[in-house]
Swiss-Prot record:
Job description of the protein: Variant histone H2A which replaces conventional H2A in a subset of nucleosomes. Nucleosomes wrap and compact DNA into chromatin, limiting DNA accessibility to the cellular machineries which require DNA as a template. Histones thereby play a central role in transcription regulation, DNA repair, DNA replication and chromosomal stability. DNA accessibility is regulated via a complex set of post-translational modifications of histones, also called histone code, and nucleosome remodeling.
InterPro entries (UniProt xref): Histone-fold, Histone_H2A, Histone_H2A/H2B/H3, Histone_H2A_C, Histone_H2A_CS
Main subcellular localisation: nucleus
Domains (record comment): The [ST]-Q motif constitutes a recognition sequence for kinases from the PI3/PI4-kinase family.
Sequence similarity: Belongs to the histone H2A family.
Ranges for region Disordered: 1-20
Record-linked PANTHER family: HISTONE H2A
Protein name, as recorded: Histone H2A.v
Cross-link Glycyl lysine isopeptide (Lys-Gly) (interchain with G-Cter in ubiquitin) per UniProt, renumbered positions: K121
Subunit structure: The nucleosome is a histone octamer containing two molecules each of H2A, H2B, H3 and H4 assembled in one H3-H4 heterotetramer and two H2A-H2B heterodimers. The octamer wraps approximately 147 bp of DNA. H2A or its variant His2Av forms a heterodimer with H2B. Interacts with Nasp; this interaction directly or indirectly destabilizes His2Av.
Post-translational modification comment from the UniProt entry: Phosphorylated. Phosphorylation of Ser-138 occurs in response to DNA double strand breaks (DSBs) generated by exogenous genotoxic agents. Phosphorylation is dependent on the DNA damage checkpoint kinases ATR and ATM, spreads on either side of a detected DSB site and may mark the surrounding chromatin for recruitment of proteins required for DNA damage signaling and repair.
Residue ranges with Basic and acidic residues bias: 1-12
């Protein structure tokens, strides 16, 4: 068949498929995030192509930030495995992440905190006239 389309691609090698994540330089799956965004919209699934890339970049950055802080927390405690406790310490220790992530982390425990009014005053040293030396008073009566 002369003039047909059969020989159109015969001289060229087919280009290898490049994912949108690779094009954007991301590790998170842009295509999967785009699919989830489309399934959760009410306007008949119309989501711009760059919205998925931007969302994937945000999720990747936040994940990297939390994992870095949790890794530092686990390293401070001299263990090699990140646990929910380390994630809790990392998120609650950072002011911006704490305001962003309000979720309760299962198995995360609590953050130690003592209110300033409950902390005792500085110890005062008073000369005791009957004893030789200083006496430490923990509370003023």
């Amino acid at each position: 068949m002369a003039g047909g389309k059969a020989g159109k691609d015969s001289g060229k090698a087919k280009a290898k498929a490049v994912s949108r994540s690779a094009r954007a330089g991301l590790q998170f799956p842009v295509g999967r995030i785009h699919r989830h965004l489309k399934s959760r919209t009410t306007s008949h699934g119309r989501v711009g192509a760059t919205a998925a890339v931007y969302s994937a970049a945000i999720l990747e950055y936040l994940t990297a930030e939390v994992l870095e802080l949790a890794g530092n927390a686990s390293k401070d405690l001299k263990v090699k495995r990140i646990t929910p406790r380390h994630l809790q310490l990392a998120i609650r220790g950072d002011e911006e992440l704490d305001s962003l992530i309000k979720a309760t982390i299962a198995g995360g425990g609590v953050i130690p905190h003592i209110h300033k009014s409950l902390i005792g005053k500085k110890e005062e040293t008073v000369q005791d006239p009957q004893r030789k030396g200083n006496v430490i008073l923990s509370q003023a009566y």
